[in-house]
């Protein structure tokens, strides 16, 4: 039997189990072990993001704060059976409600706004998801974007590093991919810190009125929260940044083993109230998707994801509830019943709600 095939799962399980014991002992404060060099390596072209600071505890209400009357949704329509994106729909093909009250769609379009895409690349854990095939797929997907779109690169494990700021220059993207921090198998997958810092960076996107997308490249979908902002704070930051979270997971035997172990261990940790962050849940909540495929097929997978982003619809409305009271408003966007066929049901993926921002007062 190949010793390497045995040692990798054993190492992953050992590290995960040790992490669980450490996190449970620390109660609510998780301090990850340091990497070999103490922190993420500094970027040579762009400054490293400052370490995140813990924000005040947030209410438990599901919320996204909007300070303007116009509410904008970024929605994707898929065939339920095949997962294929559906294009060429009209405003009249949708029905929108807020807190159960039907709303009038006043703004509508498809593929009309530029994209701001942040590739968030995992550099920690037992397996390195960033292979030469993944590098090639990222570069090819960036080349398929439109001239007005922009791309940025960020890496994470115990810390986050902004490798390349938003750019439309292909040479800068290539340079960034060639200078990612090295993989550190002793470091963690600190999703809470990565999501929080990514959200803060997305607020400074060059396309403030465009569509903001975070594409996570990783081998796992859940991990314990590390020190810094909680997973809840990171989630809130993502929602308030207006970003859609997607994921690409290069599939392999080792990856399935590591991801399965982490799902099990974080599930056990949850019983002890040890906090964790989950990529699948955040993608679902923001209207994104997580795609998994073998490295040899990733060109096609990335192409599918970019195609899905291109066929998303921009839906805007002004709420019939004029109050600016900070209340949570639940949204539901569907296609009209006449378009639903028994053998070809359509589903809509979009964010689930927002908070009506309070009017600012001056003294």
Predicted features, each with a name:
Residues 10-22:
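Bacterial N-terminal signal peptides
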């Amino acid at each position: 039997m190949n010793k390497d095939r045995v040692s990798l799962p054993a190492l992953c399980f050992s590290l995960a189990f040790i992490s669980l014991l450490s996190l449970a002992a620390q109660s609510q404060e998780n301090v990850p072990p340091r990497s070999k060099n103490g922190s993420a390596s500094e970027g040579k072209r762009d400054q490293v993001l400052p370490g995140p600071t813990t924000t005040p505890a947030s209410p438990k209400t599901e919320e996204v704060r909007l300070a303007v009357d116009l509410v904008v949704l970024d929605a994707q329509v898929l065939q339920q059976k095949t997962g294929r994106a559906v294009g060429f729909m009209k405003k009249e093909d949708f029905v929108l409600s807020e807190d159960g009250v039907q709303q009038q769609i006043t703004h509508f379009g498809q593929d009309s706004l530029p994209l701001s895409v942040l590739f968030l690349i995992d550099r920690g854990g037992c397996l390195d998801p960033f292979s030469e095939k993944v590098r090639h797929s990222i570069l090819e997907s960036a080349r398929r974007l439109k001239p007005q779109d922009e791309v940025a690169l960020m890496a994470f494990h115990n810390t986050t590093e902004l490798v390349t700021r938003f750019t439309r220059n292909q040479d800068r993207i290539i340079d960034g991919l060639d200078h990612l921090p090295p993989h550190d198998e002793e470091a963690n997958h600190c999703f809470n810190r990565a999501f929080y810092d990514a959200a803060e960076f997305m607020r400074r996107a060059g396309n403030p009125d465009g569509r903001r997308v975070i594409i996570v490249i990783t081998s796992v979908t859940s991990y314990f929260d590390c020190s810094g902002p909680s997973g809840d704070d990171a989630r809130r930051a993502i929602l308030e940044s207006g970003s859609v979270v997607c994921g690409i997971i290069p599939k392999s035997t080792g990856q399935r083993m590591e991801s399965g172990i982490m799902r099990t261990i974080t599930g056990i940790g949850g019983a002890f109230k040890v906090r964790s962050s989950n990529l699948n849940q955040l993608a679902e909540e923001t209207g994104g998707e997580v795609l998994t495929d073998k490295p040899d097929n990733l060109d096609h997978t990335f192409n599918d994801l970019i195609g899905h982003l291109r066929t998303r619809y921009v839906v805007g409305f002004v709420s019939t509830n004029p109050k600016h009271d900070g209340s949570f408003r639940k949204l539901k966007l569907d296609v009209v019943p006449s378009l639903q066929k028994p053998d070809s049901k359509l589903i809509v993926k979009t964010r689930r709600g927002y908070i009506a921002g309070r009017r600012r007062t001056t003294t």
